[in-house]
Amino acid sequence: MRALHVPAGSATALLLPALQRVLGGSDPALVAVPTQHESLLGALRVGEQIDDDVALVVTTSGTTGPPKGAMLTAAALTASASAAHDRLGGPGSWLLAVPPYHIAGLAVLVRSVIAGSVPVELNVSAGFDVTELPNAIKRLGSGRRYTSLVAAQLAKALTDPAATAALAELDAVLIGGGPAPRPILDAAAAAGITVVRTYGMSETSGGCVYDGVPLDGVRLRVLAGGRIAIGGATLAKGYRNPVSPDPFAEPGWFHTDDLGALESGDSGVLTVLGRADEAISTGGFTVLPQPVEAALGTHPAVRDCAVFGLADDRLGQRVVAAIVVGDGCPPPTLEALRAHVARTLDVTAAPRELHVVNVLPRRGIGKVDRAALVRRFAGEADQ
């Protein structure tokens, strides 16, 4: 296995031809790494032997321990790209607006290889500049046109009329990296943007469920205890650095750390409820952050929010909310937000502590860093 360093803004020039060779079987397995992350090379054992059918090793978005490295075959990557194009209405040109060394960016590049097109790339190493979107989208030319974003990028684009209008010209804007707040989705729909909510991870070659419906060839189950299991042609072979218990232990299936529900059995629409390791145990009840965040997000003064648990002597954990207040809005009180949440959820889920912040910490391609919030506000509580 070899490494390919990807300097900011150079994915199309460096990574696209390498992917073409890897997918065609003429080059050994590849791991794409940013130039500042030399430590990944040793952790993923670059230069050592790997199975012949592995095309890409992709780092996962975990926050602790050594990188596991999902081993993706050319067959899995091709199946994912083909199924995505089938669902979206056919191959097209792609705007690369997420980091190319994460699975979302790599998936854009693989789809481009399969489609025989060259993506237009935005350099997002210094942040997502929405003023560059109109020109970048214009450069995609004619035919079907797509991009993949995270919710925070979509929210930022919606603040700029020209960027909003440009996104509305695309055939689909895939949103991944975690759930998108309902107000953002509603605003995008009102602006004529075709949003496709995706669910997936490095272990599934990227998004494998679109708007709750699995792509062709993808299978879903909900296990005892509520965890989502994913099977099918897009699965990784396993991890470069195996873990115990092994989520790939059941042949043909990957057991995720996500909790979900399937409407009308295994062939129905998937609702992702949250991560098992983020559940809050409070007063004998279990509260998942995501439904509480969805409820908070409908309050007119809340522009962004995150929910997490902090240790509590009486309850075990208490539900805590950190919010970013919308422009021109007075900060809501804790009592007002508790009442707002209790209109749609059990009062147990209503936050017992509120923090107003300027921005939420994020990791990877834009996921909220709850662990950072826990560290910050647990420290304040101890003072």
Swiss-Prot record:
One of its GO terms (molecular function) is o-succinylbenzoate-CoA ligase activity. InterPro entries: AMP-bd_C, AMP-bd_C_sf, AMP-binding_CS, AMP-dep_synth/lig_dom, ANL_N_sf, ATP-dep_AMP-bd_enzyme. Was identified as a high-confidence drug target. It comes from the Bacteria. PANTHER family: LONG-CHAIN-FATTY-ACID--COA LIGASE, NONRIBOSOMAL PEPTIDE SYNTHASE PES1 (EUROFUNG)-RELATED. Pathway: Quinol/quinone metabolism; 1,4-dihydroxy-2-naphthoate biosynthesis; 1,4-dihydroxy-2-naphthoate from chorismate: step 5/7; Quinol/quinone metabolism; menaquinone biosynthesis. The keyword Phosphoprotein does not apply. It catalyses: 2-succinylbenzoate + ATP + CoA = 2-succinylbenzoyl-CoA + AMP + diphosphate. Keywords: ATP-binding, Ligase, Menaquinone biosynthesis, Nucleotide-binding. The keyword Ligase applies. This is Probable 2-succinylbenzoate--CoA ligase.
